[in-house]
Amino acid sequence: MNRRSFLLAALSFVTACGALAATPLQERADWASFFRAADAQGTIVIGDSRAGNDVTFVYDPERAARRYSPASTFKIPHSLFALDAGILRDEFQVIAWDGVKRPIEVWNEDQNLRFAMRHSTVWVYEEFARRLGNVRETAYLRKIAYGNAVVGRGKPFWVEGDLTISANEQMSFLRRLYRNELPFRVEHQRLIKDVMVNEAGKDWILRAKTGWSGKVGWWVGWVEWPTGPVFFVLNIDTPNRLGDLPKRQEITRNILRSIKALPPP
C-alpha cells in the first residue's frame, strides 16, 4: 500500500470511528447465541435511533473493525455514482441487455435500476464501472470516504478487486444516506432508498441490500419505525458458500426481533 492509499484508509477508519463514537457503544457478547444457533462466524452492528435514543450495539467489535470486500452492498453507493455522473437518469431508464447469456436467468433481459438492485444484476454495474472509469470511481470513493477507497485491478473491483470496507464503516455510510447527508443530490439519495425497500408492514419499512464475495456474506440496511430507524450491518464467513447465504437474514432478523426492531414472524 502506498503512502497516499494508507492515508486514505486511515482517514476512512477515523471517519467511521468518529461517527460511532458520537453514539453510546454497547458490546453484546450475548448475541453469540444467535450466531451459534446458525452455526456461523461473523459480526453485527446495530444502530438504534428510536424515540430520541442513539445507541450502537456490536457483537464482535474486533471483526466489526475489519475490512472485507463489500460485494453487492456496493451497489448502493455505485448507483449514486451513476446517477450523479448522468449515466443513469432515473429508476425507469432501460438498460439494454447485451445479449450475453449468464447463469442467473433474470439477468438475461433488459434492466432498470429497481430490477438490477433487487436481483443484483452484476453486468449492469460492470457497465456503470466501465463508463465511469477508475479515475472517477476513485474520486467518488474518496469523496464519501468509503472503506479503503481503492479500486484495484480485479473486476468487478467491489468483489474481485482491492476495495474493502468494515462493518463500522458501512454503518457510518448508511446513517449518512438515511439522513441525506451524502455529497449527492437529495432526490438521488431518496431514489436509492426507495429501490432498497425489501418489505414493509403497517408501521415499518425494511430497506436493505445483500452482498456475497464468495467468502463473506453481508446484509446491510435499516428498519424505519415512526419513532426512528434501526440500522444493521452483518457480515459472516460462508465456508458452505450458497448454503450459508440464508443465515445472513436469519441471524439479523432474529437479533432485530430480540430488540423489538422487527415484528414476530
Model-derived regions, located:
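Short, well-structured active-site flanking segments
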Residues: 83-99, 184-189
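N-terminal export leaders
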Residues: 3-7
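Beta-lactamase-like hydrolase cores
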Residues: 20-69
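Structured C-terminal helix/loop/strand segments within mature extracytoplasmic catalytic/sensor domains
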Residues: 23-33, 38, 130-133, 178-265
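Mid-domain, small-residue-enriched loop/turn segments at the edges of structured enzyme/sensor domains
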Residues: 105, 109-113, 125-179
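Flexible glycine/proline-enriched surface loops and loop-helix/loop-strand junctions
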Residues: 59-65, 108-110, 118-125, 152-158, ...
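Active-site SXXK
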Residues: 67-91, 116, 232
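Bacterial N-terminal signal peptides
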Residues: 9-16
